[in-house]
């Protein structure tokens, strides 16, 4: 496999993952904001449960990590823009684990009548989703720059 093909495949999966994250931040999050707090408290655990079982969601977020290992072994870090993009992808995923997962857990533990706490968690989730989408988008841009040179 050529380096260009390997980078193109990594870019495709990273773009698919970034697209999913952007969809969540720009379409699904506003829909969650329209829900009353009790409905949000029921919806978010269901969303999480379905997301972790989704072959698409898990695949597009996992394939780049798995593929990075042989990429770095074979091609090292000779393409700095591409490596920077992979680093941003890793940062976006790490941000998700640090920022989003605790929110999912807290919402699952809250009762539907804890309106103020649910409202605050929803606000935090919106911010976390936007940060994650922005970093994911930057990762795709950085990786794509490599193809311009």
Name every feature range the model reports, one short phrase each.
Residues 57-71, 132-141:
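Core segments of transmembrane alpha-helices
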Residues 2-15, 64-67, 76-91:
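Interfacial segments of alpha-helical transmembrane regions
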Residues 1-7, 51-55, 72-83, 123-129, ...:
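Membrane-water interface of alpha-helical transmembrane segments
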Residues 144-149:
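Juxtamembrane boundary at the C-terminal end of a transmembrane helix
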